[in-house]
Structures are given as structure tokens and as C-alpha cells.
Amino acid sequence: MFDFDGLSNAFSCQTVLCVGDLMLDEFVYGEISRISPEAPAPVIAVQRSEINVGGAGNVARNIAALGARCIFVGLAGEDEAGVRLRTTLSREGLIEPLLISDPARPTTRKVRFVSDHFSTHMLRADWETPAPASGVVEQALIDAILPQLPRADIVLLSDYAKGVLTARVIRDVIDAARGLGKRVIVDPKSANFGIYSGATLLTPNRKEFADATRSRADDQASIAAAAREVMRLVDGEALLVTQSEHGMTLVPREGEVIHVPAHTVKVRDVTGAGDTVVATLAVSLAAGADWETALRTASAAAAVAVGKSGTAVVTLAELRRKILPPAFLAAEEKIAQSTDDLDQRLSAWREQGLRIGFTNGCFDILHPGHVKVLTGARAACDRLVVGLNSDASVTRLKGEGRPIQDERARAEVLAALEAVDLVVIFEEDTPMNLIERIQPNVLVKGGDYSLEQVVGQELVTARGGEVVLIDILRGFSTTSLVKRAGGRA
């Protein structure tokens, strides 16, 4: 395991200059249960829709989500989609958008119709003019980009072949960046890799690579042979071929081929996962990572991204949780910050097929009896969520003078235990609402309760879950410890 904390601490000091094709991504979700009487076409009953910044704009948002600063240069039309994108990007604190207006073209917009039940894309509608930018707009792009190069730690070109990255823009940016000693990463669209000559790193997917090199690209040997020929022609330092569930293969100009397998995860939506990969690579390399560390970081980010719906960003906290096992996480990261935070973590665990357990209590003064129950609870599941009574709740249940420790202190002590994967503070006197939200596979309590006394047992068993009672250690209780301490005061 590499020092992720050491690397990620440097992310906030980096500035990435990102240039590429900006898009508006819209996802229309609904159910499909019938065929139209007017034509042999499915009818989607729309239930909700989402609009996100897409294309190179999604790259910029992923850079910012990791805590780095992004100077973003792109094109937008003078239309409603362009206004929406400008407004959204202007609200991103770590993104400095420099958008050139092109009244002659619409803002690229993609609308995807998705079956909500099956998470299947049924249809995509595109509004775009993929022709290269006009000479006037091309010059405006170059004039916007070149003055920003001295401020950047690394340059990222995100090419979707929608008109921004013309041959001239690419050439001028790469030449100027190399003159300043700046590394350039290119996520290419053109099959003519020669137009990216001088770039530090090219990151095609397997299909793009196979088309450009006319190779099979079906094993590491064929990828390496074709990649080294490409680097000889384009004067690059390395070429990375992303291969979805087959991982990533990086071929450096000198040295051994590096292959990083993909994480085993349930794929919900691959839209924008490539954006997440190149954004993470750029930030990691700018922060001083070597090739292998940057690849492993990007692979983990991709695993988080494909577990989300739509065009998604991956935050630094999410990436940290993916890379580091729960036992290595700092205590504060094992405390749910909101219901959304709780829901996201539960969703990620369920998508991995993990068995979720739940127990609860006040845990005012942690003692061996608590530890025995928590350890037993963790043994009965893959991830243990501990519901913790808030200060107000403890006072109502235990009386004045309690709790001895406030809820934050109690949560941090619990979170420091290896047996505990997540702590959730709740305000009610019982955890019934929390259990209903979590829907655990396993509900655990100490053996001083009978099955009928366990709050939420009906909910859990009705959904096919189980209730586990752990034998307690006699002679340990917080109340008795408080009394003994008071007697000695």
C-alpha cells in the first residue's frame, strides 16, 4: 500500500490547466413497460431527470473534487445550455472557467434516456456541431490558453472531437507547455496520434488504441509492442491504455510495462468514468506520484465513479475510503456526516454485495463489555454500522448528569475501533427510524436482551435479515462505573 495520505495532502497545492470540449449532460430516468401504438418503439414513463456538466467540464469538476485548482478553457454557444454551463461552472470554487463564446454553433448537449429499473441506456439524443472551431474562435482559444501555462503544474487536453482541440490549438499548447517544462496529458479522440506529438502521456481506451495502431490490443504484449511504436513516432514518455474491467496498462518509453487490474465492483453507469481517470492521473502526477502510484489512484477513482449514476465526480473522501481499508481510516472519516453521506456509503457497500450489520447504544464510557458485543457484531457481518444516541437522547434515557462524554467524543472512540466501520448519531430515544433507513442484513444486541425486546427486530426479520444476540460480560456497565467513580471522588 502506498502513502495515499502523503500524496493527497499535496493535491490542494496543484493547479491543472484543462482544455477541451464542454458538454451539457442530461439523464432522463423512467420505466419502460409498453410499446407505442404509433410505432414499434418503447415508451418511457419519465420519473425524474438530472442535468450535469459533461465532457471536459466533468474532467474539471473531478479535478476540483480532489481538492486541486483547475483553470478550464472551453467553448460554449450563446444558447440556454451555454448559459446553464457558465452559471454552474462559475459556482465551482476551485474551477476558474475561461469559456469562449461561439455564436455559430450550439453548445454540445447530450440527453440520455435510461431505464431506471435496469440502469440501462435506451437512447441518446445529441445536439452538436463537431466541426473544428473557426479561425477566429481558434485564435481566441489560443489567446486564452497560453497566458495560463505559467500558472499550471500540469496540462490536460480532453479531446471529444467537438471542435475545441483543433490541430493548431493542440500544437501551440503542447509546444508552449514543453518550452516551459510543463507535462501534458492527452485523452485523445483522433485516431491520428501524430497530432499529439510531444505530449507526455496519451490515455486512449482500448478501442481508440486499436483503431489508431491497427493492432488487436487484446493482451499486454500486443499493447506494449504497438505502444512503443507510437511513442517512437510521437516523442511521448508513456502511453496508457484503459480497458474497463480489464484494468489499465501503461507502457513507458523506458522501463517495464505496468498493469493495474480493475477493482471488482458492481458497475452502475460508465458515463464519465474516463474523465475521472484522466483527472485523477493529472492531479496525482502533478503532486509528485510515480507512474504506478498514479495508476493505482486513478483505478480506485474509476471504481468509485462507475458505482454512481450519470456523470459523476469522485471526492477526495470517497477516493480515500476506496484506497484505504476501513481499519486504516481516521476515526473522523468513520462518522457519518449526514443522511446523504450515510446513504452513499450504504449504497456502495450493497453494490459490492457486502453484508451490513447494525447495533446501537449510548456507549458513554466504553468498557470490555461493549468491546465484546461490538467485536461479535462485526464477526456476524462484512460492515458494522453503530447507531449512537445523541447527547439529548442519553439525557432523556439516563437522567441528568449523563452523558459523561459528549456525542462527538463518544463517536470518535467508537470509530477508532477496528470492529466499527461507521458511526451514525441519532436524536430519537430508539433507533427504529435509523434501522428502517439502513435496512441491515444483521441486527445485533447484547444477550441481556430477549429477542422480543430488540428494537427493530420485526423490520429486519420481515426483510429476510437475522437478529443476533451476543453473550455479555457480567460485571461491566457504564452506570456501575459512574457510581464507582463518584464514590471515589
UniProtKB/Swiss-Prot annotation:
Catalytic activity: D-glycero-beta-D-manno-heptose 7-phosphate + ATP = D-glycero-beta-D-manno-heptose 1,7-bisphosphate + ADP + H(+); D-glycero-beta-D-manno-heptose 1-phosphate + ATP + H(+) = ADP-D-glycero-beta-D-manno-heptose + diphosphate
Biological process, per Gene Ontology: ADP-L-glycero-beta-D-manno-heptose biosynthetic process
InterPro entries registered for this protein in UniProt: Bifunc_HldE, Carboh/pur_kinase_PfkB_CS, Cyt_trans-like, PfkB_dom, RfaE_dom_I, RfaE_dom_II, Ribokinase-like, Rossmann-like_a/b/a_fold
UniProt region (Cytidylyltransferase), positions on chain: 358-489
Annotated Gene3D superfamilies: 3.40.1190.20, HUPs
Region (Ribokinase) residue spans: 1-330
GO molecular function: ATP binding; heptose 7-phosphate kinase activity; heptose-1-phosphate adenylyltransferase activity; phosphotransferase activity, alcohol group as acceptor
EC number, as in UniProt: 2.7.1.167, 2.7.7.70
Annotated active site: 275
Keywords: ATP-binding, Carbohydrate metabolism, Kinase, Multifunctional enzyme, Nucleotide-binding, Nucleotidyltransferase, Transferase
CC per GO annotation: cytosol
Binding of ATP, residues: 205-208
Pathway assigned in UniProt: Nucleotide-sugar biosynthesis; ADP-L-glycero-beta-D-manno-heptose biosynthesis; ADP-L-glycero-beta-D-manno-heptose from D-glycero-beta-D-manno-heptose 7-phosphate: step 1/4; Nucleotide-sugar biosynthesis; ADP-L-glycero-beta-D-manno-heptose biosynthesis; ADP-L-glycero-beta-D-manno-heptose from D-glycero-beta-D-manno-heptose 7-phosphate: step 3/4
Family of this protein: In the N-terminal section; belongs to the carbohydrate kinase PfkB family.
NCBIfam families associated with the record: cyt_tran_rel, rfaE_dom_I, rfaE_dom_II
Subunit structure: Homodimer.
Function: Catalyzes the ADP transfer from ATP to D-glycero-beta-D-manno-heptose 1-phosphate, yielding ADP-D-glycero-beta-D-manno-heptose.
Designated name of the protein: Bifunctional protein HldE
Gene: hldE
